[in-house]
A protein has these predicted regions:
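Extended substrate/RNA-proximal surfaces in nucleic-acid metabolism proteins
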Residues: 1-117, 121, 187
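Charged catalytic cores and adjacent phosphate/nucleic-acid-binding surfaces used
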Residues: 91-106, 110, 114-194
């Protein structure tokens, strides 16, 4: 938590250094428990009239190339790892996360592997060995070919097949709940989780 609070202030400073106006107090007023995310920053800066002509933000305004999901696209473009407003945070390892999920009665599933594997499907083998029990084969981020590929991988590894749209409300306005490419009755997937 302390890391996230410190990172919030650093992200705001880094966005300012990029030449984008941001009211830190307004960002903090939108933040749950004081944690400012890249999406919150995007919402604040894109609604600030002083940024209306900022060339860095033009792609996120209506009609822009990144306007389909402006808040999360801003995050990916400026606040994700390797980007100008990225701030490193130490998280628990995947192995620890999987163990914690299992210990608390959950089912560890690899979400949107088409993105999370970053084009390196060979990583799946090591992730399976860490103990995941399922894979989100159906994802709004996947093409039909990727859906089929991850279904095949799930079957080969004996993993549960899940699906998700990655709906996040206003953060991803072009992503709709339940829209993730499942071409069959999803009850078999649901029943497998019981």
């Amino acid at each position: 938590y302390d890391q996230e609070i410190a990172a919030s202030k650093q992200k705001i400073d880094l966005v300012r250094k990029m030449g984008i106006e941001i009211d830190a107090d307004e960002a903090l007023s939108h933040a749950k428990d004081g944690i400012v995310t890249g999406e919150i920053i995007a919402e604040i800066v894109l609604n600030d009239p002083s940024n209306a002509d900022n060339p860095l933000l033009l792609p996120y305004f209506p009609g822009g190339a990144r306007a389909d999901n402006p808040y999360v696209n801003f995050y990916w473009d400026y606040c994700s790892q390797g980007k100008p407003a990225y701030v490193h945070i130490d998280y628990i390892s995947m192995k620890e996360a999987i163990s914690l999920i299992i210990e608390t009665g959950g089912v560890p599933v690899l979400a949107h592997p088409g993105i999370n594997l970053e084009g390196r499907p060979e990583l799946l083998d090591s992730i399976v060995k860490l103990g995941i029990k399922g894979i989100e084969a159906y994802s709004s981020y996947h093409s039909p070919d990727q859906n089929r590929y991850f279904i095949q991988q799930a079957q080969e590894y004996g993993l549960l097949i899940t699906g998700g749209s990655d709906f996040h409300g206003k953060t991803k306005p072009s992503v709709f709940m339940g829209n993730f490419g499942l071409e069959q009755d999803g009850m078999a997937l649901f029943n497998a989780l019981k």
